[in-house]
């Protein structure tokens, strides 16, 4: 693999951001990292790039791998020009031309302008151009679509999808994630979960994982009540060979007392997509009375409608198809 992360742990004081996580990224893989705000996405990026330390674990890159890193908040010398910030070899005509082409796509045209005169958004675009110009083997991108308009985002989608690029990125733009990434890593409850598919696949499999967790907790609660009664007895009533059962009880207690909070990762549809009606149907059910019998037309219907997608509804009964459309419109 290009990157192999083994048993990585990071904490701030008493707060553990991630605990003993492991994952790998192979050549040609495009991986998106998602998590709730404040759970450590950018910190994980910084740790992987050795910008921050970590408590334990190993980070192993393939030998001689060239890595390009886009930070969330890049810093520049305010006196240097855009071209100097992007490229140190101004006497190389071919590379200067490439720099100008990429900067133009990102709407940065004055290459002699001092970086200190640029807005924060313009500086982020210069930083993005700087990473792309160097043509690294492995791209590490923290929020690459921040401060980009629709035209720039679509250009960047095409650029990243050309060739066999290897990418690891953090983004809150679900459309960009769908267009570029073929694997999603979720950082949740200090653990990494891997989903080999797009955002819709991630949502479906994550829901399955949460349902299984709820079932496990409920089962543990039932068993916990029984074991708690046993633990409350006098020690002599338990028997002398029950140490293993006591240990198992405390492990069971941890599971039974878990609380599943609303840990849903909410990625945004960037406001630059105005004009496209995008919506999600999640577990929609619809039934009606048909001459005294229950007629089901939708049963846990789940679908994410993507930008520019065109879908037709077919069936045996035209009125039922209309009901489906009406039901979707009512949720608009």
Q: What does each model-found stretch correspond to?
A:
Residues 206-238, 242-248, 252-258:
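Intracellular alpha-helical coupling/juxtamembrane segments of multi-pass membrane proteins
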Residues 1-217, 267-323, 329:
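ABC ATP-binding cassette signature C-motif
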């Amino acid at each position: 693999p290009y990157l192999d992360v083994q048993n990585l742990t990071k904490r701030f004081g008493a707060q553990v951001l991630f605990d003993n996580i492991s994952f790998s990224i192979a050549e040609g893989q495009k991986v998106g990292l998602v998590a709730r705000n404040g759970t450590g996405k950018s910190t994980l990026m910084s740790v992987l790039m050795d910008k921050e330390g970590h408590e334990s674990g190993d980070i192993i890159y393939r030998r001689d791998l060239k890595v390009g890193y886009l930070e969330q908040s890049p810093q520049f010398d305010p006196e240097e020009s855009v071209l100097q910030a992007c490229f140190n070899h101004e006497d190389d005509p071919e590379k200067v031309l490439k720099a100008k082409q990429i900067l133009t796509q990102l709407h940065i045209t004055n290459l002699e302008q001092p970086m200190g005169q640029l807005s924060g958004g313009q500086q982020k675009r210069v930083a993005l151009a700087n990473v792309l110009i160097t043509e690294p083997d492995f791209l590490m991108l923290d929020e690459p679509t921040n401060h980009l308009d629709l035209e720039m985002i679509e250009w960047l989608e095409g650029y990243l999808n050309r060739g066999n690029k290897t990418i690891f990125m953090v983004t809150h733009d679900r459309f960009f994630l769908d267009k570029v990434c073929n694997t999603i890593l979720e950082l949740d409850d200090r653990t990494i979960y891997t989903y080999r598919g797009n955002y819709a696949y991630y949502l479906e499999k994550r829901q399955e994982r949460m349902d299984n967790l709820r079932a496990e907790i409920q089962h543990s609660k039932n068993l916990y009540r029984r074991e708690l009664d046993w633990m409350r007895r006098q020690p002599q009533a338990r028997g002398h060979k029950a140490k293993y059962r006591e240990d198992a009880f405390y492990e069971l207690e941890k599971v039974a007392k878990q609380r599943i909070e609303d840990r849903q990762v909410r990625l945004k549809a960037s406001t630059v997509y105005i004009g496209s009606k995008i919506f999600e149907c999640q577990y929609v059910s619809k039934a009606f009375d048909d001459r005294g019998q229950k007629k089901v037309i939708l049963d846990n219907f789940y679908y994410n409608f993507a930008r520019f997608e065109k879908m037709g509804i077919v069936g045996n009964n035209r009125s039922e198809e209309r009901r489906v459309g009406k039901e979707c419109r009512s949720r608009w």
